[in-house]
């Protein structure tokens, strides 16, 4: 969960620590990865790989950022608008069960969900070496150098490997070497679980070619994405030849593997793209390519350093493998250097998974070994996509933020149609998840009827402007902010008790509540998070309009709506900030989402000094969640750290960071 460590940036990055000798920014281990969750990631924003470091047969699991199942289509439901008013009426009348049944039948998109981001395939490289016979084994990820290394001794020879993903050259590069001449022997093949074939071309090119098998009902041919991967084997000394679907390198001093991959997502020819990339890289010196790659990466990575006083001597930390350090923290050790490594690993992952011109980091960043990934490895816009980018500005990686804005622009057209067809509203809308095909309709179930995704995403526009002061950027992206606000102005409706403006239907992401009659429901009106996101968006729109000197009449409408918006509620029974406009009981008091605290972080409507009563109520809500087991997922615990940072409770922030490391962090961090 290091990708979501903006919490550390909020809490630790602003401190003034006692500077010691530099923390070694290396993850390292004494054994190969036993499974995917122990492999080490590399990426250039578009291509990613998980390197296992296996001795006898290395596995390199590959990804290309645009390789998804599915195809672009209109997923709106033409029946939705006709039933919206009835759903709203039933919710206002407290007949939530009837409203839920009607909403589930008519308000969801068609189809109801997205398909999965997919693995490109696996590269297998056999060495013939016996794992049991090797000595002095080490594998490592050098964060500052953005390179994975594997080394070991066998029979008097030292074998070394290096792997990196170059953004300047657009390829993944692997090098196998030995200190004794003629000792590098490799058998190289590439596989994919479905929808592809592999073959060789010439003596040294291995090709994986395929098309995702996506056949809607009644359609005979696949509409799925075409993709290709080329592996070029270049030995130094020795020879290389093709045998069936395998390349064999024999008696080489070293061997270079250049990997390129592409899809037709942007209507380009993936074969041509792969040939261009491999042919260009083939003409370059390996060490020059590595130097250019590292200079490009360090231009971003070295902008931020972090040092925390550590009771463990530097030499001891350097000589202890990362998994052992993590195990020690689980057993109660205090190792602030591991927090530094974790923080910088988060920055490494964002640089590796999100570069200008590419797609944004998805639910798993860039790395996924499945054909059908958990939660489709999609773009969850009810926190996860946003959380990926919380570190972007505060850790000085503004360029890595840009793919998110490009992606948002690609959603606007679909979001406008969804707003019109489903709600009869102007502007644009996104619900709780999306994909690379522009999916914006409600998905999965009634919990997907959460039309706040576009509004929350727009917070990132203002964040980027606030850090950069780039007025041209704001001019380009302000229409997205205005469009999201226009949708909400049309969508808001007066509730019957006080005449406050509220959202309806409304949902607090993935959570439910118990009504006075004992019925458990998810749909309501005016969920607290909705109100907080609206306040955030409208406020930022007003500020943007002041900066740009535009839309004074629209600004007045926003101010009027803010004045009528339902206020945040503090429970008279518990003193906690209510998650819903009514003081409902929570069936799952330790729920992983803490959506009603959005105004504390990443929003800033609630502050210790500006709104002390709301801040105290938010603290009680946070304490209540934690007392009932909240924070049991890694991303949730990272959010909790951010809450404590905003509440200026450094001790609690630190304790929750230790809990994140101890309970929710895998050996590869």
Model-derived regions, located:
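Hydrophobic, well-ordered secondary-structure elements that form the walls
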Residues: 346, 457, 481, 534, ...
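Bacterial Sec-dependent signal peptides at the C-terminal "C-region" and cleavage site
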Residues: 3-21
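C-terminal catalytic domain of Rieske-type non-heme iron oxygenases
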Residues: 365, 369, 501-503, 511, ...
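Aromatic-residue-lined binding/catalytic grooves and analogous aromatic/hydrophobic interfacial grooves
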Residues: 16-446, 461-465, 482, 496, ...
């Amino acid at each position: 969960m290091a990708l979501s460590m903006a919490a550390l940036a909020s809490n630790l990055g602003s401190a003034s620590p006692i500077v010691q000798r530099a923390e070694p920014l290396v993850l390292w281990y004494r054994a190969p990865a036993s499974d995917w969750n122990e492999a080490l990631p590399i990426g250039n924003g578009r291509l990613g790989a998980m390197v296992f470091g296996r001795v006898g047969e290395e596995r390199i699991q590959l990804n290309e950022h645009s390789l998804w199942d599915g195809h672009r289509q209109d997923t709106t439901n033409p029946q939705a608008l006709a039933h919206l008013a009835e759903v709203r009426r039933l919710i206002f009348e407290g007949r939530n069960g009837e409203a839920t049944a009607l909403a589930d039948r008519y308000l969801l998109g068609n189809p109801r969900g997205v398909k999965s981001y997919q693995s490109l395939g696996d590269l297998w490289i056999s060495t013939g070496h016996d794992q049991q016979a090797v000595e002095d084994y080490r594998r490592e990820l050098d964060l500052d150098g953005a390179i994975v290394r594997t080394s070991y001794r066998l029979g008097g020879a030292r074998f070394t490997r290096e792997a990196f993903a170059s953004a300047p050259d657009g390829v993944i590069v692997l090098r196998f070497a030995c200190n004794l001449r003629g000792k590098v022997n490799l058998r190289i093949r590439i596989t994919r679980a479905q929808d592809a074939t592999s073959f060789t071309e010439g003596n040294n090119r291995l090709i994986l070619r395929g098309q995702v098998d996506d056949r809607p009902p009644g359609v005979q041919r696949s509409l799925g994405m075409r993709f290709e991967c080329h592996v070029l084997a270049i030995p130094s000394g020795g020879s290389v030849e093709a045998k069936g679907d395998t390349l064999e390198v024999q008696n080489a001093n070293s061997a270079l593997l250049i990997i390129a991959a592409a899809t037709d997502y942007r209507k380009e020819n993936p074969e041509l793209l792969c040939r261009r990339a491999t042919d260009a890289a083939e003409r370059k010196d390996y060490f020059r390519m590595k130097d250019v790659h590292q200079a490009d990466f360090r231009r971003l990575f070295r902008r931020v350093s972090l040092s925390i006083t550590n009771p463990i001597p530097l030499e001891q930390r350097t000589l202890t493998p990362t998994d052992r350090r993590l195990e020690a923290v689980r057993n109660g050790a205090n190792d602030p250097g591991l927090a530094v490594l974790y923080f910088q690993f988060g920055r490494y992952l964002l640089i590796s998974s999100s570069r200008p011109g590419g797609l944004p980091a998805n639910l798993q960043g860039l790395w996924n070994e499945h054909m059908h990934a958990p939660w489709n490895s999609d773009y969850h816009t009810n926190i996860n996509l946003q959380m990926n980018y919380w570190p972007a500005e505060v850790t000085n990686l503004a360029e890595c933020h840009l793919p998110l804005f490009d992606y948002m622009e690609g959603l606007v057209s679909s979001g406008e149609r969804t707003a019109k067809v489903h709600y009869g509203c102007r502007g644009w809308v996104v619900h709780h998840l999306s994909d690379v095909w522009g999916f914006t309709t409600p998905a999965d179930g009634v919990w997907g009827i959460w039309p706040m995704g576009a509004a929350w995403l727009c917070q990132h526009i203002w964040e980027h402007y606030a850090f950069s002061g780039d007025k041209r950027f704001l001019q380009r992206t302000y229409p997205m902010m205005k469009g999201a606000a226009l949708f909400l102005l049309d969508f808001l409706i007066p509730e019957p008790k006080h005449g406050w403006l509220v959202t309806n239907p409304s949902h607090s992401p993935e959570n439910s509540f118990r009504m006075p009659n004992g019925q458990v429901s998810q749909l309501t009106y005016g969920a607290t998070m909705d109100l907080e996101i609206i306040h955030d968006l409208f406020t930022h729109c007003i500020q943007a309009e002041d900066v740009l000197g535009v839309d004074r009449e629209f600004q007045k409408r926003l101010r009027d709506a803010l004045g009528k918006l339902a206020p945040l509620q503090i429970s008279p029974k518990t003193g906690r900030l209510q998650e819903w406009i009514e003081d409902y009981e929570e069936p799952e008091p330790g729920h992983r989402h803490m959506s009603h605290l959005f105004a504390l972080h990443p929003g800033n409507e609630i502050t210790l000094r500006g709104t002390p009563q709301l801040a105290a109520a938010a603290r009680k809500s946070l304490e209540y969640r934690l007392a009932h087991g909240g924070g049991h997922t890694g991303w949730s615990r990272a959010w909790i750290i951010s809450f404590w940072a905003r509440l200026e409770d450094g001790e609690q922030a630190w304790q929750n960071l230790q809990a994140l490391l101890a309970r929710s962090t895998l050996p590869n961090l």
